[in-house]
Amino acid sequence: MPPSAAASEPLRVVAAVIADGSRVLACRRGPGKDAAGRWEFPGGKVEAGETPEEALEREIREELGVPIRVGALLDRTTTIVGTRAIDLACYAAALTGAVPESSTDHDLLRWVEPGDLDALDWADADRPVLRVLGAS
């Protein structure tokens, strides 16, 4: 594939909206990361040969050190960030083990009520799913 074609392909990314009662887990990007200081739902890139669900389970295990059960697709959007298109699929997810206390990619984890999600400075690609979750 020519380099120009590869650059035009959207980056396939998945994210988990992990619920604990009415609250959801928000994660702040750590220093030195793309979008440092901004909030996102945890997840990451889909690797070749993975389904989105497999990628999400792997990414959460790697970043948060906990297993999850992936549920329904909540939202899928493509957002232009800089010169790159991000194809983000957000899934409902449930913890199947311990509650995460730290992350390899984030400097802060916070459980947030849906009505309070808008108070956080979200990464651009994560903003569309906020409507689905009832943020204003």
Predicted regions and their residues:
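Conserved N-terminal beta-strand and adjoining loop/helix that marks the start
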Residues: 2-25, 45, 76
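Residue-level signal for inorganic ion chemistry
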Residues: 16, 41, 109, 113
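A structural signal for short, well-ordered beta-strand segments
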Residues: 16, 73, 90-91
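Conserved Nudix-box catalytic region and its N-terminal flanking loop in Nudix hydrolases
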Residues: 23-62, 66
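Structural detector for helix-capping/boundary residues
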Residues: 44, 58-59, 71, 112-115, ...
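Active-site-adjacent beta-strand/loop module that shapes the phosphate/pyrophosphate-binding cleft
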Residues: 67, 77-100, 110-114
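NUDIX/MutT-family hydrolases
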Residues: 92, 101-133
